[in-house]
């Protein structure tokens, strides 16, 4: 604590000192005005200027006016220096302050609605007034910390979904985001998808995370599968940590084997390992059958282990996440892909990951897998010229997903690939329980916009108070002498205090929020309420029509053997086409999806092979078979999907079709744009 005289006395002393310095400087001028020599030095008098004043001479000489100028300039220079030093000393306890609206508007964080491109976090005024909205400016990632019923949904999540200009992947824990915003997203031109594997009415789009790996070159498949395994299979308890690597190896080998067999789904991996019998015999058999060297090596190693060890590996594999695919709903929802991650930057897409609070912990492995793959695919290549849309990951109830190593790493790099994260948690302790200190600090240091609403825990208010910092203020104290009450001493000292104390954070009213922005002073803003905001309310109420719900997912009553038998009949339907197909495969194996079909390759409609599409078993709506030996690959689309489904058929690459029943050339990537009625089943062959 520094004590000093009262402020007026200090100012008076500073003025006196500056005038004295100016008077001395003027005396130096008077003494040395004719030259700097030894005689002048010997005759120097500090009162030399006094002898040139009108008070001494009786008139104002030219030397006096010049000396007076020296006094004025010197005094001002000395006084300014004293003030600068004094102001610096006053800030040594801190310079924290609240940001001003003007400076935040100039920096691009506060924008009018018409200029909003990023998320919406708050507003400068109440809902009935035209104010500026807080967006993230140049900061790609954000963190929202708000307890239950604090208004993060109506104030941040829903306004962001109504206004964000790019693609969005939204974790919709309650399902209300899809109901409240999907029509607005669709009206703005988004392709809207709802991924809800455990929906009570089975209304869900599908996503197969293995399909992307199956379309990669063989030399890339092992690495991507290991990445998939690391995010899906997690150790449940300390006892499982010693077996987690082996469990992940088993998963990798299972994926590679299923890709090789033409059943690239995690459900097929579950069925593969769920076969009855001794596991070492199963692994030995798989090692003999597999043509993939990595899968062979893993199965060989496993087959040589003791039965108890193998049981531990398979148990950790199942408990770590694979047992989720015992549910037929999960199997069906991950049997095909209705949307492509590669389209997220190319065209506006909104994917709602709808999970009820009761199912969130259960589906956490699948959600982790999905986010890992989304992040991985986005970072495989820099955005091209036609990939102009940013991708926002809107992660509500982020804590319940468990530890996401892929996102923990990607938060430092994905901004360069047009990726953004918005993490929503109830308190900072949610990060503490899931990530270690280094991981927690990684999230806090890389989220450039942090929004806090009133919270009752201990950690969050303390963090906010420390992050805002302290300011310096003048503390005045008065002491009295015991001898006389009129004899007293007043002291003023510089002290520091928190701009916002932890208890003040807890007392934050329901309409306010605190925002920390990297490199900027803190902000205290009004919360947004979309249902009462004069701009957002109109946008919300303009939504019309029905929800863009997907068709109910069909669960098959047919056995796998029946499906394979039916597929075998189809594969042998046109034996004579095989030689021609091989020829075309050699000539046109590199034709890209969507390219014009070469003139000498044509689709032939076999009228004699037409049949009623209703006779196709529901299984065939999502089944595919690759028969490389006969030179053919066959895809079947059931009656519910014949006019709109995307069929991924792989004999080395993916092909998108819109047909009832198509026969492709082996290895080819040809696209037929004809669409046939639901009542007709058409067989196509390619010939030269």
Swiss-Prot record:
Q: Which cell locations does it reside in?
A: Cell membrane
The record's Gene Ontology cellular component field reads: plasma membrane
Regions annotated as coiled coil: none
Its record classes its membrane topology as: Multi-pass membrane protein
Q: Which UniProt keywords apply?
A: Cell membrane, Conjugation, Crown gall tumor, Membrane, Plasmid, Transmembrane, Transmembrane helix
The record's listing under InterPro entries reads: P-loop_NTPase, T4SS-coupling_protein, TraG/VirD4
**Annotated TM spans:** 12-32, 67-87, 153-173
Q: Which family does it belong to?
A: Belongs to the VirD4/TraG family.
| Identification of the protein by name | Protein VirD4
Gene name? Answer: virD4
């Amino acid at each position: 604590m520094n004590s000093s005289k009262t402020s007026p006395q200090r100012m008076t002393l500073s003025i006196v000192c500056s005038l004295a310095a100016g008077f001395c400087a003027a005396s130096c001028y008077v003494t040395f005005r004719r030259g700097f020599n030894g005689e002048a030095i010997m005759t120097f008098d500090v009162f030399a200027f006094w002898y040139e004043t009108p008070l001494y001479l009786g008139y104002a000489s030219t030397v006096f006016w010049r000396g007076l100028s020296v006094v004025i300039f010197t005094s001002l220079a000395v006084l300014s220096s004293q003030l600068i030093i004094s102001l610096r000393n006053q800030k040594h306890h801190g310079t924290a302050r609240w940001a001003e609206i003007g400076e935040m508007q100039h920096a691009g964080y506060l924008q009018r609605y018409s200029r909003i491109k990023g998320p919406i976090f708050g507003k400068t005024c109440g809902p009935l007034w035209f104010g500026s909205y807080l967006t993230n400016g140049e900061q790609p990632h954000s963190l929202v910390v708000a307890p239950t019923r604090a208004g993060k949904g109506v104030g941040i999540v829903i306004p962001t979904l109504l206004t964000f200009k790019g693609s969005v992947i939204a974790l919709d824990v309650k399902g209300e985001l899809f109901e409240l915003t999907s029509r607005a997203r669709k009206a703005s031109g988004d392709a809207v998808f709802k991924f809800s594997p455990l929906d009570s009415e089975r209304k869900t789009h599908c996503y197969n995370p293995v399909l992307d790996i199956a379309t990669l070159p063989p030399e890339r498949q092992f690495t991507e599968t290991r990445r998939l395994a690391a995010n899906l299979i997690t150790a449940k308890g300390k006892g499982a940590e010693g077996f987690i690597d082996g469990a992940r190896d088993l998963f990798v080998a299972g994926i590679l084997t299923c890709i090789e067999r033409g059943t690239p789904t995690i459900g097929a991996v579950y069925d593969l390992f769920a076969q009855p019998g001794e596991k070492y015999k199963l692994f030995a058999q798989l090692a003999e059958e597999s043509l993939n060297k990595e899968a062979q090596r893993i199965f060989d190693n496993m087959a040589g282990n003791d039965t108890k060890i193998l049981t531990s590996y398979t148990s950790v594999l199942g408990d770590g996440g694979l047992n989720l695919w015992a549910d037929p709903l999960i199997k069906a929802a991950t049997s095909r892909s209705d949307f492509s991650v590669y389209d997220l930057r190319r065209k506006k897409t909104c994917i709602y990951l709808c999970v009820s609070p009761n199912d969130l912990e259960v589906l956490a492995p699948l959600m982790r897998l999905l986010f890992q793959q989304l992040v991985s695919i986005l970072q495989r290549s820099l955005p091209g010229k036609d990939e102009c849309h940013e991708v926002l990951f809107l992660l509500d109830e982020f804590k319940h997903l468990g530890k996401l190593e892929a996102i923990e790493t990607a938060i430092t790099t994905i901004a360069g690939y047009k990726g953004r994260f918005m993490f929503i948690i109830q308190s900072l302790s949610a990060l503490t329980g899931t990530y270690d200190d280094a991981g927690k600090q990684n999230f806090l240091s890389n989220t450039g916009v942090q929004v806090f609403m009133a919270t009752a825990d201990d950690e969050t208010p303390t963090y906010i108070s420390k992050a805002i910092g302290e300011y310096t203020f003048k503390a005045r104290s008065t002491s009295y002498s015991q001898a006389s009450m009129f004899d007293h001493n007043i002291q003023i000292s510089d002290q520091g205090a928190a701009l916002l104390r932890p208890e003040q954070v807890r007392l934050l009213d329901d309409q306010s929020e605190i925002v920390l922005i990297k490199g900027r002073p803190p902000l205290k803003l009004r919360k947004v309420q979309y249902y009462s905001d004069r701009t957002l309310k109109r946008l919300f109420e303009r939504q019309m029509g029905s929800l863009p719900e997907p068709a109910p997912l069909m669960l098959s009553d047919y056995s796998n053997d029946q499906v394979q038998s039916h597929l075998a009949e189809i594969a042998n339907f046109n034996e004579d086409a095989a030689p021609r197909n091989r020829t075309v495969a050699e000539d046109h194996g590199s034709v890209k999806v969507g390219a014009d079909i070469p003139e000498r390759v044509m689709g032939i409609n076999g009228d004699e092979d037409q049949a009623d599409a209703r006779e196709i078993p529901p299984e065939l709506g999502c089944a595919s078979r690759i028969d490389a030996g006969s030179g053919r690959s066959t895809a079947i689309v059931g009656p519910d999907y014949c006019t709109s489904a995307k069929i991924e058929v792989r004999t080395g690459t993916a092909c998108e079709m819109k047909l009832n029943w198509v026969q492709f050339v082996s290895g080819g990537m040809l696209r037929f744009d004809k669409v046939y009625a639901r009542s007709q089943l058409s067989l196509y062959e390619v010939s030269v």
